[in-house]
């Protein structure tokens, strides 16, 4: 409907760039990359490390953020999250960003936009492992930027502003129905490193202690 598109295009989805709204993307399409495919893999561990498994991935996440303390993921599920496509990557306000469009319903009998409260959106993120998906999208984008912009390895995340999940059935111009996050630098760097080189509990504890 017309109201839906007005709400979508006028939604102010970037907390750190309050003047930005989605309609601006269509005025500058050269800064947009839709359906950006990626493939992350679990590399062979270097000396002194062990292969990153689903349980060690959960341990890594929990070390940085207590929200993950009840996080459970099978090896099959983990492999599924390592390959995919980012719905939209774009440049705005001097940073690079990720958008993921979601169509989840909260109430299958009587779903209304008003149901998409911050608490309900947080529950959708947690229950569907979208928080993990978001972090892996940012690892993938970090790597792409380092290659395409010829940035020194380990610096790509500094150019990223964060990721926004837009739940389309609840979105409005005040950003209801959206979830924004920019995980800690140390978490993204740790995930990137452990995927490439294997897990190290000693390194994890050291990085989590000084995480920013």
Q: Language-model features: where?
A:
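Structural signature of nuclease core domains in nucleic-acid processing machines
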Residues: 1-212
């Amino acid at each position: 409907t017309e109201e839906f598109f007005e709400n979508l295009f006028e939604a102010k989805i970037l907390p750190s760039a309050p003047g930005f709204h989605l309609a601006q993307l269509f005025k500058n399409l050269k800064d947009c990359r839709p359906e950006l495919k990626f493939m992350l893999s679990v590399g062979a561990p270097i000396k002194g490390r062990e292969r990153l498994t689903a349980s060690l991935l959960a341990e890594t996440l929990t070390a940085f953020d207590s929200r993950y303390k009840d996080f459970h993921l099978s090896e099959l599920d983990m492999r599924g999250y390592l390959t995919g496509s980012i719905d939209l990557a774009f440049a705005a306000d001097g940073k690079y960003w990720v958008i993921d469009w979601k169509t989840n319903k909260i109430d299958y009998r009587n779903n209304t936009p008003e149901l998409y409260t911050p608490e309900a959106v947080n529950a959708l993120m947690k229950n569907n492992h979208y928080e993990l998906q978001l972090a892996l999208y940012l690892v993938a984008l970090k790597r792409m930027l380092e290659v395409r912009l010829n940035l020194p390895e380990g610096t790509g995340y500094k150019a990223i502003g964060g990721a926004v999940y837009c739940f389309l059935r609840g979105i409005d111009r005040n950003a209801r129905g959206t979830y924004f996050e920019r995980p800690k630098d140390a978490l993204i760097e740790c995930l990137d490193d452990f995927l490439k080189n294997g897990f190290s509990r000693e390194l994890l504890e050291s990085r989590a202690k000084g995480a920013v």
